[in-house]
């Protein structure tokens, strides 16, 4: 196990109807003038936004709204939010929604006190200060409610980049599983897929002797298989949604990623898909992850994939041919994704195989490699996209 520091200061408020306490927590963490960031009309139609605004008013907090956040959140609304915060002298940002809303709120939060372009922080500069952010979560998926990360798409360049710093961890997050019951089944399935991706990307490591976090990660994956099936059968199953919501936070606040090398190639490969084709992030991951796993199994990564197959998917270990076990586990994962309605091919997300050379270039690999478990050069990216497209894998 590697040396590590771990800092996770977010205060979590979990359970039914806990969003009614939001105003109290905003005040507790120093807010007096609040920007409420949300997505589309669902927050208004459901009455959630009105309830949030009412509880802020009960605490004598000044609040203004900024709606219109879209999936794969764009830079344009971030600039708009920064200007609004400065005009209104905002001192606290409240995100009401899922990961896209929270990531937008975080980007605004680091942009307000900064004299330059907020995109600097999505191009390598590390933020050192931010307005405080709180969240009311409505979609279990990204884990942004407990993470130090934000992902934004630059509308001009179509770059989909991330910023990371402890100042981006929310002060508090309200998690009411009942708020996710109105989600379309497809969106719920995309969230399940994203949660599993965050778990896998910590699981696939070359760091030895990390049994505690191995077992924690395997436990989350097993729970997602079970609860994912339960919520697909009964979308109003509160307990299934509660477990999924908590898994989304736990798998991405990095308590299960400490002391070990991680591999984020699946997300890296997917980001250009959702940036170019505007597909749901979870859908893109469902297409990319099995292809990435298959590539790893064929290029020296079969041992841990076989462990996953046995411990998570219940496959029998073939000690004479671990790769066979690994491939069996990958097929079991694909079958699960299909069972919850996820796409598995380029065609199903509207991606064109003819664009693969462009997708590879969008990843800005150069002559280097990405990832940790199995390093991927430009040819490897090309091969994985072709596997995801159902093509053979010719050389570039």
Which positions does each model-derived feature cover?
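Short Gly/Thr/Asp-enriched flexible loops that form oxyanion-binding sites at enzyme active sites
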Residues: 51-52, 81-82, 101-114, 146-147
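A glycine/threonine-rich phosphate-anchoring loop and its flanking beta-alpha core
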Residues: 113-209, 303-307, 311
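Glycine/serine-rich anion-binding loops at beta->alpha junctions
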Residues: 90-106, 138-144, 276-279
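Short alpha-helical scaffolding segments that buttress acidic/His motifs in well-ordered protein cores
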Residues: 196-200, 241-252, 289, 333, ...
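Active-site segments that bind and position negatively charged phosphate/pyrophosphate groups
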Residues: 202, 206-331
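C-terminal charged capping/lid subdomain of soluble metabolic enzymes
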Residues: 308-396
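ATP/NTP phosphate-donor binding region
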Residues: 1-92, 346
């Amino acid at each position: 196990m590697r040396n590590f520091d771990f800092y996770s200061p977010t205060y979590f408020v979990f359970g039914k109807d806990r969003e009614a306490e939001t105003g109290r927590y905003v005040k507790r963490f120093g807010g007096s003038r609040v920007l409420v960031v949300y997505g589309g009309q669902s927050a208004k139609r459901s009455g959630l936004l009105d309830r949030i605004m009412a509880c802020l008013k009960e605490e004598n907090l000044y609040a203004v709204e900024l709606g219109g956040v879209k999936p794969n959140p764009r830079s344009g609304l971030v600039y708009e939010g920064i200007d609004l915060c400065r005009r209104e002298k905002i001192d606290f940002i409240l995100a009401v929604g899922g990961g896209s809303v929270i990531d937008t709120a975080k980007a605004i939060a680091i942009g307000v006190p900064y004299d330059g372009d907020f995109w600097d922080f999505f191009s390598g500069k590390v933020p050192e200060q931010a307005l405080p952010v709180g969240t009311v979560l409505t979609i279990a998926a990204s884990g942004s409610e407990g993470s130090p990360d934000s992902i934004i798409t630059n509308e001009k360049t179509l770059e989909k980049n991330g910023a990371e710093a402890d100042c981006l961890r929310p002060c508090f997050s309200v998690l009411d599983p009942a708020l996710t019951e109105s989600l379309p089944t497809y969106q719920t399935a995309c969230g399940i897929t994203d949660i599993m991706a965050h778990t896998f990307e910590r699981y696939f490591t070359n760091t030895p002797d990390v049994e505690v976090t191995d077992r924690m990660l395997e436990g989350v994956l097993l729970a997602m298989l079970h609860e994912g099936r339960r919520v697909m059968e009964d979308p109003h199953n509160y307990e299934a949604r509660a477990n999924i919501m908590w898994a989304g936070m736990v798998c991405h606040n990095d308590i299960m990623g400490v002391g070990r090398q991680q591999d984020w190639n699946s997300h890296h490969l997917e980001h250009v898909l959702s940036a170019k084709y505007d597909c749901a992030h979870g859908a893109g991951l469902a297409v990319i992850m099995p292809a990435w796993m298959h590539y790893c199994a064929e290029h020296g990564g079969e041992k841990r994939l076989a462990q996953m197959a046995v411990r998570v998917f219940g496959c029998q270990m073939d000690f004479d041919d671990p790769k066979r076990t690994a491939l069996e586990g990958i097929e079991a994962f694909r079958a699960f994704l299909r069972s919850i309605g996820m796409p598995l091919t380029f065609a199903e997300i509207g991606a064109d195989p003819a664009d693969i050379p462009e997708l590879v270039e969008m990843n800005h690999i150069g002559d280097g490699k990405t990832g940790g478990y199995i390093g991927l050069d430009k040819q490897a990216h090309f091969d994985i996209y072709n596997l995801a497209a159902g093509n053979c894998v010719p050389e570039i």
